[in-house]
Amino acid sequence: MLYFSTRNSNEKVTASQAISHGLAPDGGLYVPESLPQLTLEDIKALGKENYKERALKIMKPFLDEFTEPELKTMIARAYGDNFDSDSAAPVHFLDDNTAVLELSLIHI
């Protein structure tokens, strides 16, 4: 996937170039040239994954120049042991069509 500046859509860069630059040379933000399409089933399946697996599936289409093992390593290093469990942001299903994402700073 390629990225372009919010101030100039003509010059495109790779994800690693966008990450390395931070901001585009013209001061704009880098945005993806397209957004991956997810089906309802894709979205429901994300709720059944642990946080790191969910992060991988969400990031992978945006960072397609990196291999899956590279992405897994980056995710593991980014999140490390900073959370009480692998479910850093657990999803609780209330029924087949309703889920709640738990975001908590303190676990008692």
Question: What is the predicted role of each segment?
Answer:
Residues 106-108:
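Conserved small/polar residues in nucleotide/adenosyl-binding loops
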Residues 47-103:
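Glycine-rich, N-terminal phosphate-binding loop and its surrounding beta-alpha-beta segment
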